[in-house]
Amino acid sequence: GLYDYIIQLITRFYMKMTDGQIPDFENKVKVMHAWGGRQVPGVYYNACKNNGISPITFGEAKKHGNAFKYICEKFVDATQYDANKMYDYVLIDEAQDFDISFYQLCRSIVKDDHIIWCYDEVQNIFDVILQNPKETFANKYDPKGIDLIEEQKKYPRMRNDIVLHKSYRNVKKILLVAVALGFGIYNDKLIQALENNKHWEDLGFTVVEGDCSKEERVIIERNEKASPLVVDESRIEDCIRIFQAPDFSQELDWIAKEIEKAITVDKLLPEDIAVICLDETNSFNYFNGLEQRLEAKSIATYNVMDRDYVKGFYREGNVTLSSIFKAKGNEAAMVFVIGCDVFEDKKDSRIMRNKVFTAFTRAKIWLRISGTGEECLKQMLYEMNQLKEHEFKFDFLNKPTHLLDKDWNERSENYDNEQAFYEELLEMSRKKGISVDRILQMYTQKKKEDEKIDE
């Protein structure tokens, strides 16, 4: 689902940096699915072809449990973790969805361990265990893996971890609702949390009160600068709208009418609207019924769940209908998250919470939430109302729970300290008229002399 969007973003950035030149997607930059096949290029399929290995079909792979994990492990074994180097760099997006076997496959086909992976653990909807690089890249062919601390020493000016403090995708209100529900801030028990105050601060929040490393009350708010996307104050209340339908048919009727209004009255383009179904079991019935209603209103739809779907999330003149997985990484001005009644019985599930977070954060400006049944969104509404009553701050008792990945936090802090020292060193170099190289030579020589004295 991300294919076209990534192509668009790369092209836009490349043109800006090169005064209008178009990137060479045939020979220089490859944007691919992870698996691939004869009709659609993919990392695994292309790697097999490049290394003289017969690609394993899905039909065969699924006999062994986790099909994708199986084929990646087989590739690593077949090449003994040392395949032909096909790429100068490999960038993995939505990396939280991939098993470590895929990371190892990518490492085996790239030069000099030049791998960049981007992830958001709160969007981990498959319960994949995110490990540190040592464990992720270590196997029987290389027990050491990749040690980012050691790599940092080799390249002191290069940052191994970059934490994105700002969120340009969503207006602040939608982001805060998504985080509150994703973490279970106002649930009767906290579902997941960040390890300490700095972890929150790194992500654009301010801990107003409390210590997030302890079991105590904490109050957290969002920095204004960390959410630069703003909407007119008169339309803030319209950002999020919720509908509890008496029955399934009326839920579909409401969604269709809201989409029609958005296009005819608010003048949104159909491709500015996406519908994401939280109820995966009934997604076919939802989309089938919605397609019929929208067709009656002369509104075209693009169902990325169709069997004939190949790639892309948007189609000009069409409203997108999508699963949560296909929507990951994409966005739309207005997003309908439907079938939300399934949340009620799974409110204590971390995977369900992550799905809600992922679905809600696809919306840039307008979020529409619906479900079927009397008081079907009771828990969700309760938590959202609690957030509103607390003036969109997180006010909760921090308790032991699932901690989101914290390794990068320590590495990020190490980098900040090292970068600050390096800048001080540069400043001293300028003031004293001594080059940095000369300072390092003097330091090395002095260290050797001190070691001799100690002996």
Show where each model-derived region lies.
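Conserved helicase NTPase motor core
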Residues: K30-A34, R38-Q39, V43-E135, K166, ...
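Conserved helicase motor core of SF1/SF2 NTP-dependent helicases
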Residues: L2-Q21, Y89, Q96-T358, R362, ...
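P-loop NTPase motor core
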Residues: G1-Y45
